[in-house]
């Protein structure tokens, strides 16, 4: 990474900055601390990309700043916080693709192209051939979890993938055994496990993670690492005074302050280790001033405010379409039925509130009711998540959208 933060590298992902190199789809409504990106996006996009090839480094430059991105050499370690349904499906998928058992369907980096020059030039190389990204063969997985099950056992328990596929990958998946997790049931009420770290305070737990990360990197001979939070949704939290500065944040860790959640401890450990951090849950995590300052100080990129793979993804597709046609919205009702561990966690009102806040804010952010009050002011937006064990991991989602068009005539969309 460059020695000083570069806007394109250190900024969290935003819907206002096209970024073809993102590996993971994430929620498109950033928290308030990220929203200044909109004001700065034009400035960021001034930086042209020069001297780029599969084997050479990026050079991003303007008159004042130059930043280098080294080519992807050596192994890339992907450290996953949580080894449940999401992580094991991700790991098994990569292992299956590496062995020619499956195709990388849904992967932007592996299947999508990037246009060079004019459309008529017909220059559309695959992103993976144009950008110096790590090859799938160079990816190594590690994880933390509150349960000691290997990736194979966890995948079998989750029941997302077919047993026949998992049987073909069993040797690789059995090798991935989770390290003891940083966990506190106060933040995830419906779960408890035995594979948990102990420490006198939260700073000591962070120091254990930092040492563990360094040892894991050495043992697996990785050139670089990235950390992804793929664990359960924590209880709803607001920004606290201890989050304002790095000094107050670190003191709060030593004091075992309740405003420091486990996800923040992981993010802190990653950033102190110079490791990029992606948040795949709607938790208040890296998006606090103290951790954003640490990321900037160490020139480490961060991103994420929940994975975007289901109902919220559909909203971010449909809502811009309604807005583009200047169609009004009376209301949007969404419900989910799921019976997996995620559903069990979200059955707790405090964890559900974290998810609900994230899901509710996405429409307001896209539709801008303050700009178009006659179309979007005071629309009703209801989100329900129902835990129903017989459904298992086969989540079901329903949406009813009440819109109005020419002369105010009402219409309905059902998904």
Say what each PLM segment does.
Residues 6, 17, 37-38:
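Short linear segments in intrinsically disordered or otherwise low-structure-confidence regions
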Residues 11, 22, 42-43, 57:
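Ala/Thr-enriched low-complexity intrinsically disordered regions
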Residues 23-40, 44-51:
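Short, positively charged and aromatic/hydrophobic N-terminal segments
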Residues 58-281, 285-297, 311-319, 412-415:
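Metallocofactor- and cofactor-centric catalytic cores in central/energy metabolism, strongly enriched
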Residues 77, 81, 293, 300, ...:
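Active-site-lining helix/loop region of Rossmann-like oxidoreductase modules
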Residues 277-281, 302-306, 330:
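Short catalytic-loop micro-motif centered on adjacent basic/acidic residues
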């Amino acid at each position: 990474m460059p020695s000083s933060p570069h806007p394109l590298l250190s900024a969290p992902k935003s819907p206002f900055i096209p970024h073809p190199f993102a590996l993971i789809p994430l929620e498109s409504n950033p928290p308030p601390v990220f929203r200044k990106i909109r004001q700065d996006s034009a400035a960021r996009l001034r930086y042209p990309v020069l001297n780029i090839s599969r084997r050479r480094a990026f050079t991003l430059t303007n008159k004042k700043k130059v930043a280098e991105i080294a080519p992807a050499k050596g192994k890339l370690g992907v450290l996953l916080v949580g080894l449940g349904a999401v992580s094991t499906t991700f790991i098994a998928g990569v292992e299956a693709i590496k062995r020619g058992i499956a195709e990388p369907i849904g992967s932007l980096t592996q299947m999508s192209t990037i246009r060079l020059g004019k459309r008529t030039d017909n220059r559309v190389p695959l992103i993976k051939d144009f950008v110096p990204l790590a090859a799938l063969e160079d990816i190594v997985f590690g994880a933390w979890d509150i349960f000691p099950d290997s990736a194979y056992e966890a995948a079998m328990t989750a029941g997302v993938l077919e047993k026949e596929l998992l049987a073909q990958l069993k040797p690789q998946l059995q090798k991935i055994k989770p390290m003891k997790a940083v966990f506190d049931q106060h933040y995830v009420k419906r779960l408890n496990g035995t594979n948990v770290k102990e420490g006198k305070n939260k700073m000591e737990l962070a120091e254990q993670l930092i040492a563990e990360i360094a040892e894991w990197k050495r043992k697996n001979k990785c050139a670089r690492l990235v950390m992804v939070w793929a664990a359960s949704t924590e209880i709803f939290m607001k920004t606290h005074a201890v989050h304002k500065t790095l000094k107050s944040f670190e003191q709060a860790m030593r004091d075992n302050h309740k405003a420091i959640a486990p996800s923040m401890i992981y993010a802190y450990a990653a950033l102190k280790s110079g490791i990029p951090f992606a948040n795949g849950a709607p938790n208040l995590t890296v998006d606090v001033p103290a951790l954003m300052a640490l990321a900037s100080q160490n020139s480490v990129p961060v991103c994420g405010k929940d994975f975007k793979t289901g109902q919220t993804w559909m909203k971010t597709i449909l809502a811009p379409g309604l807005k583009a046609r200047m169609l009004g919205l009376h209301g949007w009702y969404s419900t989910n039925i799921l019976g997996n561990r995620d559903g069990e966690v979200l059955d707790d009102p405090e964890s559900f509130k974290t998810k609900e806040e994230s899901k509710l804010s996405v429409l307001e952010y896209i539709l801008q009711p303050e700009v178009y009050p006659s179309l979007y002011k005071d629309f009703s937006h209801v989100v329900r998540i129902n835990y129903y064990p017989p459904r298992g991991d086969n989540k079901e989602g329903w949406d009813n959208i009440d819109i109005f068009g020419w002369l105010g005539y009402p219409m309905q969309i059902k998904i």
